């Protein structure tokens, strides 16, 4: 048989076409398999984590206790992973309402309030209620609206403890609970002042020979308490003890006692006993110096950090207490360096103001 180059060329061309078709078919099949494999594999891209946005309105930062509250809220928010937005009302009740409404307009998912005035704050609480934003109260409460959780010391018990301490000290001095006492009330309009006054008044009334010779508002303020105590000292030559609703009240009272030349050291029969509340650095220094006898310490850092855990509990559908009483600790010269004081009372050493 004769060999034909033309026939060979036709065979090569036909083979090339068949090979190309097979290659296209195999590539298409591979692509289909790859597509199936990709669609059936789970996505490895993590969804972005959305932080809970929390608004916090504090009454003031004019004393160490409130600085402690702020520090605790910040620590708690960081630990819980919150996006925290803060405002300071600087002692202005209407400003605090406006601040709270502004926080709500920013889309916060929870609001923490430390009210200046328990009545003035009601519209802000009710607005949060209407928006289904849970309200958490810190140290001071509201007289209206729905509050999810109120975290504070038991201020009625705190006031009663102050009265009981005075009665015990007067018994040691005179053999029975008797003497003249001054009551410097806190900032009128706050639940803390109202409750402490109730606790103190109810307890001190159990001792008929203890006379409350003066009750005046100290306003949780050193200058106001200084002025109030100055007037009281001018009117009453015999005063045995002073109850200050917080340590700013007592610091003001101590200055007035000094200015009047009425200071006598611990153990002297003329010593005017002074007890306050909060456990501020000034109070601790005054206790060491013998100017103040005692303070009922409440730890605002721990208190406010605890409140932040309740926001997490609420958001994760766990039970949240309507009221949570933060523990207090009475500090005097005998226990100021004790382990108990270090654990429960010396929060002020962590605060810079």
Would you name each region that the model predicts?
Residues 2-34:
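Sec-dependent bacterial lipoprotein signal peptides
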Residues 3, 36-353:
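A residue-level marker of the well-folded mature domains of exported/periplasmic proteins
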């Amino acid at each position: 048989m004769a060999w034909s180059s033309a026939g060979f060329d036709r065979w090569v061309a036909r083979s090339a076409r068949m090979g190309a078709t097979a290659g296209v078919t195999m590539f298409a099949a591979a692509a289909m398999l790859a597509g199936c494999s990709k669609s059936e594999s789970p996505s490895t891209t993590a969804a972005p984590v959305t932080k809970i946005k929390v608004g916090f309105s504090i009454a003031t930062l004019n004393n160490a206790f409130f600085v402690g509250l702020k520090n605790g809220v910040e620590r708690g928010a960081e630990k819980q992973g919150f996006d925290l937005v803060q405002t300071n009302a600087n002692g202005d009740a209407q400003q605090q309402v406006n601040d709270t409404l502004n926080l709500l307009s920013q889309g916060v998912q929870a609001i923490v309030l430390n009210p200046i005035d328990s009545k003035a704050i009601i519209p802000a609480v009710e607005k949060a209620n209407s928006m289904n934003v849970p309200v958490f109260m810190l140290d001071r409460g509201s007289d209206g609206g729905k509050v999810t959780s109120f975290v504070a010391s038991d201020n009625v018990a705190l006031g009663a403890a102050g009265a009981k301490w005075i009665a015990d000290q007067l018994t040691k001095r005179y053999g029975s609970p008797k003497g003249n006492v001054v009551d410097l009330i806190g900032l009128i309009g706050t639940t803390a002042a109202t409750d402490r006054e109730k606790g103190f008044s109810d307890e001190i009334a159990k001792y008929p020979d203890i006379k409350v010779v003066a009750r005046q508002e100290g306003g949780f303020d050193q200058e106001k308490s200084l002025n109030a105590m100055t007037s009281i000292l001018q009117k009453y030559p015999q005063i045995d003890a002073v109850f200050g609703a917080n340590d700013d009240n007592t610091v003001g009272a101590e200055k007035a006692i000094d200015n009047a030349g009425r200071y006598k050291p611990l153990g002297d029969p003329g010593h005017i006993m002074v007890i306050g509340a909060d456990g501020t650095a000034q109070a601790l220094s005054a206790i060491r110096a013998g100017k103040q006898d005692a303070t009922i310490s409440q730890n605002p850092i721990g208190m406010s950090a605890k409140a932040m855990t309740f926001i997490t509990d609420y958001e994760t559908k766990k039970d949240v207490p309507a009221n949570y009483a933060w523990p207090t600790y009475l500090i005097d010269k005998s226990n100021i360096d004790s382990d108990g004081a270090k654990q429960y009372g010396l929060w002020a050493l962590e605060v810079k103001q």
